[in-house]
Amino acid sequence: MTILASISSIGNIKSSSKSNIASFSSSSLQSLNSIQCCSCSPALGNTVGNLVGGVLFGTGVIVGSVLNTVGNITTPILHPDCGCN
């Protein structure tokens, strides 16, 4: 009887941790989609700008700023139903 109870409680712990992982990854994906869709953060422009800036210092900052500005202007037009969370 004690062995069965132990196995049962171990099973509950495993299923509980699986559901926590699933909900965490779901919320992470949702926030990631929000950032990609809405350009809520200037990460893309800054990343590209920094890569270019590694080759041409100064130009990378300008390219990053331009990409962010273009993204902020075009995203509401191209994805009107997408909102930043």
UniProtKB/Swiss-Prot annotation:
The lineage of its organism: Eukaryota, Amoebozoa, Evosea, Eumycetozoa, Dictyostelia. This is HssA/B-like protein 59. PANTHER family: HSSA/B-LIKE PROTEIN 17-RELATED (PTHR31857), HSSA_B-LIKE PROTEIN 17-RELATED (PTHR31857:SF2). Disulfide bonds: none annotated. It comes from Dictyostelium discoideum (Social amoeba). It comes from the Eukaryota. The gene is hssl59. Belongs to the hssA/B family. InterPro entries: HssA/B-related (IPR008455).
